[in-house]
Each structure stands twice: as structure tokens, then as C-alpha cells.
Amino acid sequence: MTQDVEMKDNQTPTQSVVSAPTSTLQNLKEIAALIDTGSYTKEVRRIARAVRLTVGLRRKLTGSVISSFLDFALVPGSEAHTRLSSFVPKSDEHDMEVDTASSNSQAPPKHLPAELEIYCYFIVLLFLIDQKKYNEAKVCSTASIARLKSVNRRTVDVIASKLYFYYSLSYELTNDLAEIRSTLLALHHSATLRHDELGQETLLNLLLRNYLHYNLYDQAEKLRSKAPRFEAHSNQQFCRYLFYLGKIRTIQLEYTDAKESLLQAARKAPVASLGFRIQCNKWAIIVRLLLGEIPERSIFTQKGMEKTLRPYFELTNAVRIGDLELFGKIQEKFAKTFAEDRTHNLIVRLRHNVIRTGLRNISISYSRISLQDVAQKLRLNSANPVADAESIVAKAIRDGAIDATIDHKNGCMVSKETGDIYSTNEPQTAFNSRIAFCLNMHNEAVRALRFPPNTHREKESEEKRREMKQQEEELAKYMAEEDDDDF
């Protein structure tokens, strides 16, 4: 079997080498034709379709294919052709022969639309980032942004939003993200004036990411609150916005709103974006712990997340038990992981929740217990643990975390009997929150449905066309009758 396979490979060595770049180049030419048509007819959906098709070809892009496509799409010797060709490695003679033969089969467009030139910047930038040539990608992305500033056409907006993203990514990968903040602000201002809503979405998220990268949460919130909001055009951008909003709300101690934003971002994110959903779940777990909730075990056992969420699973277990010593050990064990995830400061806040959880378990288990035993069970390592335990119990009683009293004379905590929870409003509140969640999900699903654009206008135009045709027929009949009368 091995010999047969080797013989087949040896019989047609050129076909296996030639077919891949030829088909990819042909696909790029079809995309160029689609962009040319979209530019001529001013149909944004054609440009959007071209971008989606390019994402599918991303892994097949090679230096020889891109070089041949640049020769096909751009005018040889032009400024754009010279600049972009300098970023692409020179192909060998064999590939050049194949590309030349295939390019002769289809003539290049007579005119060069701005959309096609911007698209060439886009695929070259994709290629450079995939090849990990980040410094060259910075130069290419900067040139593409400079070219974009001179173009004011709505058909470019879809490609421009992609260029904005990779422009920021190239600077982030080289640790120079602060350099482009003023440029992003200027671009966002221009997009707002031009009513480019997709560009506004993308640039707002990039600015929020820029601020949060340097822990500038106050500036991020000021920008977010003053930026114009509208119906989301891209699900990916909306998910990113919810994630950044959840992080800002968490730092501002608004845990309820943060939890809602983070869970919604994780739920709306595409299945393929595993890394993004993991980040959302990490922050959502911490926020739920800060709210006094214990996340379900199923969250930690999701496909592809078991290993990365393991530190947070052990942390959740320590909080659930209320063991302060175990919590400290886990905090030290995974300190590097928490620092990389930028959740270390939030985990420090959890110490108070661990103590309260342990105290709640003690109050449920014992109707009467001395403060010294409380300090031992909570493992308070301080100079005066009894006084600390008394202070902790007093604060928990004041905040309503436990239903108990302190017997100062005997130095003990006396727990009250737990009443019937169904006689309170808690079940009604929980049921109301679940119903509200289901209704919101239904409304979001309805809003997310796609309807053909301008359907009512098409009906009107068909009716008008029918009326005009009927009027023309009546006019022709009337003129024919007049001619008969003349004769």
C-alpha cells in the first residue's frame, strides 16, 4: 500500500504543487470581481460577502499567490503596488510561471476602484500577521490607515472595520498599543461624522481594549458613556463590547450588571471563539463568587475549558467550603495564572467572602458556639483572634448575612432558628428573575432575526411598475383609437 501511494505521488508531482495556488488565486480573482461589482452598484452586501470569503481562504494565502494577485488587481508600478509588493517575499520561477499562465486567462479590471485597493492592503496585512512579521505588519497597517483617511465611501466601511482591528492588533503584538490611541480617537470621530456605524462599533471596542490594557478604567468608562450607541451591526463586536463593559462594571463594584454583561457575552459568542468564551467565563466566575453565588459545576466541565478553568474551579471550591487557609494556598499556587488573567486583584477581594461563607456554615451548624471556637474554625491567624471573630460576626449580623446574636457576657454567638423561606418574598424574586431572563432572551432572538432589506419598498416598486405598465397599455390603446378616428 505504501509503494502504491508513493508511485501515485511520483506520477503527478506538478499537479499537487500547482493546483493549490492556482485555485486560491482564482478565488481571489472572483472576490476582486465581486468587489468591483459592489463598488459599481454601491452594494455593501457584496463587499461584506467578499470579506467573508477571504476569511475562508486565509490559511491558503502564500507569498506567490498574493504577489500574483497584486499584479492582477493593481496597476504595475503604481504607488500601492510598489508599497505592497515590498512586504511580500519574492516567489520562485515555478510559481511565477503558474501564476502568469493563470492570470492571462482573465484580464484585469479597466479601472481600479478604491475598494479593491483597500482590499489588497487587507490581504497583505492578514498574510504578514499570520507569518508573524509584526513589525512589517505595523508599517503596512499604518499605510492602510493613511490611505483610508482619503476615502469617504460607504462601500469601504466593511473592509475598513477589519483594517482597524488588525491595525490595533499589530501594535498590540509589538507592545506599542499606547502609540495609536490618539489615531483611534480621530478615526472614531471621523466614523461618527460619516455615520459609519460598523466603524464606530469596531473603533469603540478597540479604544476600550486600549484603555483596559493599561488599567485606565475611569477613562474607558467616560468614553463608553459618551460614545453614541445604536443597534449592533456585528455580533462579534457586540460580544466584545459586553465583555469590556463587564470588566469595567466589575472594577466599579457593580457586580450585578457585570455578571449580566459577562454571561450575555459568553452566551452570544460564536462556538468557534473558544478563547473569548474562556475569558468571559473566568471573569463571570469571579463576579458570581463576589456576589455570594456558587457557579454550577457544568461551567467548569465545558468542552475545551476543563484545563484552563481548573484554577478557578479549585478557587470556587475553597470559597464554597469557607476555608480561609485553603483559599490562601490556592491563591499562592496559581498566582502566576491569576496575574496573567489580570484577576489577582479581584481574587484578593474574595477573602471577605470566604470568611462570610465559613461563618454562615458555622451559624447553620451550631445554635450556640463560643467566639474562640469561631476563630479557630475560620482559622484567623492574628494577634487577637477572638476580638477579630467578634468583629466579623457583628458585621455579618449587621449586613444580614447571618441571623444570629452575640452574647457578650459569655463570649459566644447564638444562632436563631431558620424560618420557612417560602413565607418570604425570595421564591417570588427568584422566579421573577428567571422569567425576565427568558423574556429578554426571546426578545434578543427576535431582534437578531435577519429580514431581506427594503422588502416593503420592493412591494411598492412592483405595484408602481404594474400601474405604469397598465397606464402605458391604456395610453397605447387610446392613441391607437385616435389613429383609427383620424383615418
Swiss-Prot record:
A GO BP entry: regulation of protein catabolic process
Biological classification of the source: Eukaryota, Viridiplantae, Streptophyta, Embryophyta, Tracheophyta
Recorded GO MF terms: enzyme regulator activity
Species name: Arabidopsis thaliana (Mouse-ear cress)
Tissue specificity statement from the Swiss-Prot or TrEMBL entry: Preferentially expressed in flowers.
Subunit and partners: Component of the 19S regulatory particle (RP/PA700) lid subcomplex of the 26S proteasome. The 26S proteasome is composed of a core protease (CP), known as the 20S proteasome, capped at one or both ends by the 19S regulatory particle (RP/PA700). The RP/PA700 complex is composed of at least 17 different subunits in two subcomplexes, the base and the lid, which form the portions proximal and distal to the 20S proteolytic core, respectively. Interacts with UCH1 and UCH2.
Claim: Nucleotide-binding is one of the keywords in the record: no
Biased composition (Polar residues): 10-21
One cellular component (GO) term of this entry: proteasome complex
Annotated region (Disordered), positions in chain: 1-21, 452-487
PCI domain residues: 239-420
Descriptive protein name: 26S proteasome non-ATPase regulatory subunit 3 homolog B
UniProt keyword terms in alphabetical order: Proteasome
Compositionally biased residues, Basic and acidic residues: 455-480
Task performed by this protein: Acts as a regulatory subunit of the 26 proteasome which is involved in the ATP-dependent degradation of ubiquitinated proteins.
Family statement drawn from the similarity comment of this UniProt entry: Belongs to the proteasome subunit S3 family.
